[in-house]
């Protein structure tokens, strides 16, 4: 059977060691003999390339890039969130790591309903504010991936270092970052800390400006010195819980201590002779992807005009 494997890393696709293509480059295929790194930010992608040049494997690179994205892509890549990782080993085995956020123990089925049973909008609801935050899984997820599937050639501290350096020294704000910060203006200006971090002199950072994050650099430095447990049991954990208490959040020290990243068995399906391997629940992506492709198998796409409305309808 021909095989097509789809792998989802935290906003990251990694195969093995290679150059990075600029988004501004012409839309020509990018080829590499030994593999490649791709993410939503070129600076972060180059971190992954450097890791592999130093002897690290794809998992090492994915970890370093994930941490770098916590600096360069705060809209999605961050220490305070979570994600999924798909890994294919050299022997052909595939596995999945689930490090999505978990609900705090104090959360309950009506936590986002007001006294009248209506959904709370804005502050206090499921999307905005301290009560919307889940227990972060990123650090535990990277820890599990490194312990089980890292090359063993690079240490935890070495993989964290590029992100620490980026946060301390700063990086040039991209157009997409400037745009996303401005698009989140309503929420970033609402809280004193986000306003202080993401605004300079009352204005959002602009494309090309240097963006430094000293507090984030200090967090990475603590992770380097004390390891992953620092985030869940040490000074960083205490800072998170104290901020939650000040702002009516739900997360406690017990929630952080109790977080566990899990290794799961990927879901599998078939599409026109290809085997599809993807992320299992709690991600809906893999199951939905396979269902979509199974539906498409009932149609002869080759007979449809490339730009026909029927083809667009089916593919959408």
Show which residues each predicted segment covers:
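Internal maturation/activation junctions in enzymes
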Residues: 298-316
């Amino acid at each position: 059977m021909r095989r097509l494997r789809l792998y989802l890393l935290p906003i990251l696709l990694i195969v093995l060691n290679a150059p990075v293509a600029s988004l501004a480059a012409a839309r020509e295929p990018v080829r590499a003999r030994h593999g490649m790194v791709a993410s939503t930010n070129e600076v972060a992608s180059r971190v992954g390339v450097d890791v592999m040049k130093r002897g690290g494997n794809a998992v090492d690179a994915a970890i370093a890039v994930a941490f770098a994205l916590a600096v360069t892509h705060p809209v999605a890549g961050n220490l305070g969130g979570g994600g999924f990782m798909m890994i294919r080993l050299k022997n052909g085995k595939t596995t999945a790591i689930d490090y999505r956020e978990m609900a705090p123990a104090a959360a309950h089925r009506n936590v986002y309903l007001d006294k009248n049973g209506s959904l709370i909008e804005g502050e206090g609801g499921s999307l905005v504010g301290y009560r919307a935050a889940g227990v972060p899984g990123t650090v535990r997820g990277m820890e599990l991936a490194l312990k089980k599937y890292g090359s063993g050639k690079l240490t935890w501290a070495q993989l964290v270092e590029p992100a620490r350096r980026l946060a301390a020294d700063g990086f040039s704000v991209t157009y997409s970052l400037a745009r996303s910060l401005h698009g989140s203006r309503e929420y970033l200006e609402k809280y004193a800390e986000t306003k202080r971090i993401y605004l300079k002199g009352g204005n959002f950072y602009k494309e090309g400006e240097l963006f430094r994050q000293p507090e984030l650099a200090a967090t990475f430095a603590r992770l380097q010195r004390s390891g992953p447990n620092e985030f869940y049991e040490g000074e960083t954990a205490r800072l998170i819980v104290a901020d939650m208490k000040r702002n009516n959040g739900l997360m406690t020290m017990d929630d952080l201590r109790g977080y566990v990243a899990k290794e799961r068995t990927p879901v599998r399906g078939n599409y026109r002779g290809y085997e599809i391997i993807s992320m299992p629940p709690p991600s809906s992506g893999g199951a939905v992807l396979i269902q979509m492709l199974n539906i498409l198998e009932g149609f002869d796409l080759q007979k449809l005009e490339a730009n026909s409305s029927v083809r667009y309808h089916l593919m959408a």
